Amino acid sequence: KYGNLIPSLAEDWSVSKDGLTYTYKLRKGVKWYTSDGEEYAEVKAKDFVTGLKHAADGKSDGLSLIQDSIKGLAEYVSGESNDFSTVGVKAVDDYTVEYTLNKPESFWNSKVTTATMLPVNEEFLNSKGSDYGAPTPSGILYNGPYFLKSLTSKSVIEYEKNPNYWDKDNVHIDKVKLSFWDGQDTGKLAENFKDGSFTMARLFPTSASYPELEKEFKDNIVYTPQDSTTYLVGTNIDRQSYKYTSKTTDEQKTSTKKALLNKDFRQALAFGFDRKAYASQVNGANGATKLLRNLFVPPTFVQADGKNFGEMVKDKLVTYGDEWS
């Protein structure tokens, strides 16, 4: 609920006083399994070292998130160093992994949850060679709650519960089937939900069939976190190029520049744009406001005295002059 990290493969962790060293104590008895459910090995601290080295050697796309964080990793990735032992990851013992950072990062634990930081069993990696990680059941070694059972491109992906998963009692879905949708027939998704083929399907609030679906399934419709985003749209107050504009004369260019430098003009643009109407083109009238943001975080991220940050700002702005009221 509050975004707190809950250990899984690790039981606990500690941070050095200078914030540079993170030490993780691994859960004992967690096993690797093949796609057939056969026990392969125990998950050990060295698997995390192997995993990071594999990502670095393979120039993983996710490296940019961590390579400037972990001591020596950027140098290894760039080729400045070819000695991975200089990289700030170490298996202290079978159940203790230690990471050394270049500088303190209070958000470091959130990076540990990314795919680049996952463990890799060295023996399995070497046995598979270039086929390691292939999107087939046998190309993957498993320590999580599900096995990949099948993957057909542009068709379906199927998973089955790992009966030996260490936390299996908290895994309540036995089979997962993900069906491919090509983005064409939006009505087909709702039909598959209605006939029981899907247990979850996306609805499109701007489709012709949505009003009827909303009445029929009003208690089943939920809005997922809205992440369709346009970042940092601003006014160019130092315009130099007029290549892609109808403003061609010096007088027109001068007038344009004066307008852009005028605060009232810029505010008029901001206040005149009907963001709700714009957002409703995708989310419909009822869901439009769920897309709107004035901040990089949800409006409820900071609250005090029963009011969220946006409400507090609105109350304060009226005291700052007529231009904000």
What are these regions (language model features)?
Residues 82-85, 94-95, 101-177, 187:
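Gly/Pro-rich hinge or "lid" segments in bacterial periplasmic/extracellular proteins
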